[in-house]
């Protein structure tokens, strides 16, 4: 069986895709001023979103782990 990608791996892949898209977009833009604004926007967005996405990933893993632990505990009678 193939391993499923981790939340961190998916988040990293998402940010890499967004970064690549931003770089491609900046190459298509000819105005240096517009390029600088776009670069600043992407950097600021990444800076602000990274902690939120990491926390959401951690919270999701903890939430799912709770249910896995419930299933593995023997039922008390």
Swiss-Prot record:
It comes from the Eukaryota. Plasma. The modification Pyrrolidone carboxylic acid is found at residue 1. InterPro entries: ApoA-II, ApoA-II_sf. GO terms for cellular component: spherical high-density lipoprotein particle. One of its GO terms (molecular function) is lipid binding. The modification Phosphoserine is found at residues 31, 45. It is found in: Secreted. One of its GO terms (biological process) is positive regulation of interleukin-8 production. Pfam families: ApoA-II. The modification Methionine sulfoxide is found at residue 26. The keyword Secreted applies. The keyword Protein biosynthesis does not apply. Signal peptide: none annotated. Keywords: HDL, Lipid transport, Oxidation, Phosphoprotein, Pyrrolidone carboxylic acid, Secreted, Transport. PANTHER family: APOLIPOPROTEIN A-II. Apo A-II makes up about 20% of the protein of the HDL (high density lipoprotein) phospholipid-rich fraction in plasma. Belongs to the apolipoprotein A2 family. Monomer. Interacts with NAXE and NDRG1. This is Apolipoprotein A-II. It comes from Macaca mulatta (Rhesus macaque). The lineage of its organism: Eukaryota, Metazoa, Chordata, Craniata, Vertebrata. The gene is APOA2.
């Amino acid at each position: 069986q193939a391993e499923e990608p981790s939340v961190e791996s998916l988040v990293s892949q998402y940010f890499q895709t967004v970064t690549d898209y931003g770089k491609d977009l900046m190459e298509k833009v000819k105005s240096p001023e517009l390029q600088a604004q776009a670069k600043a926007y992407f950097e600021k967005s990444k800076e602000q979103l990274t902690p939120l996405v990491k926390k959401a990933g951690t919270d999701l893993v903890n939430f799912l782990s709770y249910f896995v632990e419930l299933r593995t505990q023997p039922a008390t009678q």
